[in-house]
């Protein structure tokens, strides 16, 4: 909603010289051109913006593909307004600025009830999005300190007209910013009309209207615009005009007779019949139309220049809003207001001169004799924050690969604004005859494999990057500390490994693995700011340091691209000059140190600190061990699978061509669309901007309707995906140094608390189909060992029984029988021995549908039954398990009241969707509120089990190691002689990870490959 209107309303906001623009900034866009000399405002300028019209245009400019946040908030209008303001103020730098809004119905509606009545009403969903956008824009304007002006009973046009008149009378040059032709009537000496055009590479140039060119657009001078519009009307506002009078006739009449009354007086003598009769018949309508289009200039509203004067923006508030709206480039571009305190080592400056930049003490420690003082300072700090910088091995297929990287330097922060950089493996690039010369003054080794990469990168590096500018200026030779295994570095190794020295990091698992490869076992980890952010709000779009710094300490980080360039042109970190690397790494460590101060109190206040301390943090080390260990694959099997998959894909291709009636490019959506919907005339239920959709849901729907081709297309897509994702990719990702596959587990991605894995993703290999089982058959143990897999049985249903405490559900699990058979017996009202396989299958589907909040529509599609029958099943289910329904309802109610739900272990998930105006979004929020405690508790359980199992394996000095976590399953590599012991250990720890009202059951199996563990 807009701020409430009063007689004269101005909500203060401001600041333009410091406004920053987004990437591909339109600030220098030609759409804001310099006006012609003859029409240039030369004095003190007052810009009056027709705000509502601009917002409306920005909202609908992206209506087919709106900008949205991760949480679904439509940001199109907000983005358009910010973009516009930045272009306008950067190009024109006004001294005074006002943003003018309508205040609701005006006197024109009373005078003519049909005024604007033809405007199309927005749908409920669009209206909700528009209203939310208006609220955000008011926040943005307030942060910019731009006054929002309106007057009850009048339109923005009247407010602008009144203020423009007063401004011109007081000697100001007034610029009205609008694309509305009505404003041309206000143009006079010292009053201009500026149509802002559109930004972007295909932008429409702005246009200026002044007294010199005021007649160009409409063909009449500004003083006769109302007379002209009185006759032609205005369809956008439903101003009737005079039927039978067109634009040319109206221009001719104005040119010959002048104002409307003179034209009406001359009407009887007009020689042309049509305009004569029209004017005689509709004279009063013409007078009414002129009244409607005439902008008032005499409202009881004084021009208050102190209010309108451009002021400094509230950058902290702007950054907060931009982060919330995910305008991250804009947020980073705002001036930095980070305040830090410098604490110096002996020899540091005693005082730092006052400056607008952050106060920092970032020191390069590149000599062994400096280390002792720095290490002593670190040991006296309450905690230290660490950062590692690396170069990835040339043979790694990944850009960031902790297990195939070499350590270049370490950043250590001991207090806000105080950090130290320890260079270990920097090389030097110096300018030489327009090129860069790779040097090695430091004495550090430079592999032959790295040299060509360095030379190539140096030639292509963007001169705009910090490192490239430093190199071009002539960086000093790189000095490095000895390698970490040198005897002189023993104190540093001791500090990093000492569990008594508290350490924090951002993405600590990465640093842990990097240091392990360098021979260091990181000890004393007490916090990880990325994990802390995740526990505080798992729904946050990103837990990256740059966004956390913006949101929590109002600081814009230097990015890797800022430092070293981007893409293939990016400099490797060991080629970045040490002084640049120091500032970059120290900033990361420094910000991490400060974020820890922010997050720990919040975790305690939120009652999530125990989950963070006892589950998420210990799991970091467990996952690091799992990733370090890796898993072996049978390369010969994958080679044979590649041949088999190729044959299968070719077979399906031929069947597709037969079903389609000819060959076509199966991977081309336009060609596939033509075959499905033009050639075969299949029904289309979903459209995109380019035509009927061919996505998986459409193919599934067509396949269920009995059409052959969609079935084959789905099979083809599955084969292609398995082939590219696993058959081709997995062998290529094997680490040549270990001969094993090392996945990366992500702790901060899934809002439920579940882990995910990437590079490669080993959690989505299908198990129910033979093709997926063939891929799993390629995962094997070392010689003399077996794979052991332990899987929670029906963990989510058991958790639902515990959380709901439904007597029938709890009893079904305590009896130890088949839960789906027992459910079928209850909902179909038959004895256990009378349950058929079909009844059990339906009961199983209903059990899991309950967890995920599926309604009758989704269930009817799954079971392929009528909607009414599915609805009856659900009603019968909840009649038998009333406690389940009460629990699910109470979970949604709790979420509405508190804004979040919790797991058994107090993990929170915030659900803002419950407050959304959109019904579908709210429904999603309700389903999320119902199932998140169940899914999240399952995630917590297996994490606790992983920690306990790892601890026992180490404590009992067993060789067996955990290799994978796949949802509710853990996979181990176990020597034959340890199999019995480890089987019992794993089963015990998983089944006793928590005490529930129903037993936890774990199925354990072993075999010579992953598939055999299930037999």
State what each model feature region is.
Residues 48-49, 176-178, 384-386, 505, ...:
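Short hydrophobic beta-strand that contains or immediately precedes a catalytic carboxylate
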Residues 647, 651-654, 658-711, 879-927, ...:
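C-terminal polymerase-core module
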Residues 202-236, 550-580, 589, 593, ...:
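A short, charged helix-loop
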Residues 12, 20-43, 93-98, 146-147, ...:
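Non-catalytic nucleic-acid-binding/docking modules located in mid-to-C-terminal regions
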Residues 282-479, 497, 506-508, 516, ...:
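Conserved "right-hand" nucleotidyltransferase catalytic core of DNA-directed polymerases
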Residues 55-61, 184-189, 393-397, 509-519, ...:
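Short active-site loop/helix that positions an aromatic residue
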Residues 571-574, 621, 628, 735-738, ...:
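Conserved catalytic core of nucleic-acid polymerases
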Residues 12, 20-22, 26-177, 181-210, ...:
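Noncatalytic, basic helical substrate-engagement surface that gates or grips nucleic-acid strands
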């Amino acid at each position: 909603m807009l701020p409430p209107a009063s007689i004269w309303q101005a909500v203060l906001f401001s600041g333009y010289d410091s406004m920053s623009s987004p990437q591909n900034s339109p600030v220098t866009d030609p759409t804001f051109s310099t006006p012609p000399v003859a029409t240039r405002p030369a004095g003190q300028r007052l810009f009056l913006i027709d705000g509502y019209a601009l917002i409306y245009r920005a909202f609908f400019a992206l209506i087919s593909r709106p900008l949205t946040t991760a949480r679904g908030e439509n940001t199109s209008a907000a983005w358009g307004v910010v973009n516009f303001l930045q272009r306008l103020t950067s190009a024109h730098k006004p001294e005074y600025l006002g943003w003018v809004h309508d205040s609701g119905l005006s006197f024109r509606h009373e005078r003519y009830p049909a005024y604007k009545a033809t405007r199309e009403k927005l749908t409920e969903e669009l209206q909700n999005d528009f209203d939310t956008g208006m609220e955000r824009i008011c926040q943005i304007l307030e942060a910019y300190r731009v006054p929002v002006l309106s007057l009850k009973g009048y339109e923005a046009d009247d407010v602008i007209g009144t203020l423009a008149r007063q401004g011109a009378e007081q000697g100001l040059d007034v610029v009205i910013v609008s694309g509305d032709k009505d404003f041309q009537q206000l143009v006079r000496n010292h009053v201009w009309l500026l149509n802002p055009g559109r930004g972007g590479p295909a932008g429409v140039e702005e246009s200026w209207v002044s007294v010199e060119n005021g007649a160009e657009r409409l063909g009449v001078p500004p003083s006769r615009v109302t007379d002209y519009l009185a006759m032609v009307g205005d369809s956008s506002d439903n101003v009737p005009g005079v039927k039978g009078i067109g634009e040319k006739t109206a221009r001719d009449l104005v040119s010959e007779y002048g104002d409307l009354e003179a034209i009406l007086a001359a009407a009887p003598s007009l020689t042309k019949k049509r305009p004569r009769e029209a004017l005689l018949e509709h004279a009063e309508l013409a007078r009414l139309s002129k009244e409607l289009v005439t902008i008032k200039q005499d409202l009881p509203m004084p021009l208050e220049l102190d209010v309108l004067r451009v002021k400094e923006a509230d950058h902290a508030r702007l950054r907060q809003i931009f982060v919330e709206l995910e305008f991250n480039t804009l947020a980073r571009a705002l001036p930095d207001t980070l305040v830090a305190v410098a604490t110096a080592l002996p020899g540091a400056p005693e005082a730092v001169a006052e400056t607008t930049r952050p106060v920092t003490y970032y020191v390069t420690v590149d000599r062994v004799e400096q280390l002792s003082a720095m290490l002593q300072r670190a040991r006296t700090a309450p905690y230290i924050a660490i950062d590692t910088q690396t170069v990835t091995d040339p043979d790694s297929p990944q850009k960031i690969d902790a297990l195939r990287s070499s350590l270049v330097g370490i950043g250590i922060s001991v207090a806000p604004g105080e950090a130290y950089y320890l260079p270990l493996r920097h090389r030097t690039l110096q300018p030489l005859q327009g090129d860069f010369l790779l040097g090695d003054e430091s004495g550090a080794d430079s592999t032959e494999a790295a040299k060509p990469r360095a030379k190539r990168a140096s030639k292509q590096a963007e001169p705009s990057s910090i490192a490239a500018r430093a190199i071009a200026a002539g960086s000093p030779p790189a000095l490095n500390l000895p390698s970490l295994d040198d005897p002189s570095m023993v104190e540093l190794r001791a500090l990093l490994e000492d569990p008594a020295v508290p350490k924090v990091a951002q993405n600590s698992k990465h640093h842990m693995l990097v240091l392990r490869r360098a021979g260091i076992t990181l000890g004393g980890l007490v916090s990880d700011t990325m994990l802390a952010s995740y526990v505080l709000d798992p729904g946050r779009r990103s837990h990256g340091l740059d966004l956390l710094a913006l949101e929590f300490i109002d600081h814009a980080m230097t990015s890797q691209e800022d430092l070293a360039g981007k893409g293939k042109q990016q400099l490797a970190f060991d080629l970045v000059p040490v002084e640049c690397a120091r500032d970059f790494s120290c900033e990361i460590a420094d910000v991490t140190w400060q974020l820890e101060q922010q997050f720990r109190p919040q975790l305690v206040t939120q009652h999530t600190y125990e989950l963070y301390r006892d589950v998420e943090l210990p799991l970091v080390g467990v996952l690091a061990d799992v990733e370090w260990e890796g898993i072996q694959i049978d390369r010969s099997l994958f080679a044979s699978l590649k041949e088999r998959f190729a044959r299968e894909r070719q077979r399906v291709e031929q069947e597709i061509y037969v079903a389609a009636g000819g060959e076509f490019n199966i991977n081309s959506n336009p060609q596939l669309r033509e075959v499905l919907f033009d050639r075969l005339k299949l029904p289309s239920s979903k459209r995109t901007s380019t035509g009927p959709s061919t996505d998986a849901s459409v193919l599934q729907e067509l396949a269920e309707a009995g059409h052959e081709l969609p079935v084959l297309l789905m099979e083809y897509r599955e084969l292609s995906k398995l082939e590219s994702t696993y058959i081709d990719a997995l062998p290529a990702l094997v680490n040549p140094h270990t001969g094993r596959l090392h996945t990366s587990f992500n702790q901060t991605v899934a809002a439920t608390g579940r882990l995910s894995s990437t590079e490669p993703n080993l959690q989505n290999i299908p198990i129910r189909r033979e093709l997926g089982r063939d891929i799993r058959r390629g995962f094997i143990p070392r010689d003399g060992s077996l794979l052991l897999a332990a899987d929670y049985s029906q963990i989510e249903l058991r958790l639902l029984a515990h959380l709901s405490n439904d007597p029938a559900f709890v009893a079904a699990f305590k009896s130890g029988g088949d839960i789906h058979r027992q459910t079928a017996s209850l909902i179909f009202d038959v004895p256990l021995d009378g349950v058929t396989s079909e009844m059990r299958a339906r009961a199983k589907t209903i059990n899991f549908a309950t967890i995920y909040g599926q309604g009758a529509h989704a269930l009817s599609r799954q079971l392929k039954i009528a909607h009414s029958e599915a609805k009856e099943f659900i009603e019968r289910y909840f009649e038998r398990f009333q406690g389940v329904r009460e629990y699910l309802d109470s979970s949604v109610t709790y979420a509405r009241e508190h804004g979040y739900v919790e797991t058994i272990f107090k993990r929170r998930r915030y659900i803002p969707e419950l407050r959304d105006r959109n019904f579908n979004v709210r429904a999603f929020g309700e389903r999320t509120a119902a199932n998140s405690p169940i899914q999240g508790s399952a995630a917590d359980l297996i994490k606790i089990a992983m920690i306990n199992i790892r601890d026992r394996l180490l404590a009992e000095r067993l060789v067996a190691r955990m290799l994978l976590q796949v949802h509710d399953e853990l996979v181990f590599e176990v020597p034959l002689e340890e199999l019995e012991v480890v089987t019992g250990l794993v089963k015990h720890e998983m089944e006793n990870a928590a005490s529930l009202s129903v037993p936890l059951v774990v199925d354990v199996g072993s075999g010579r490959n992953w598939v055999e563990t299930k037999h």
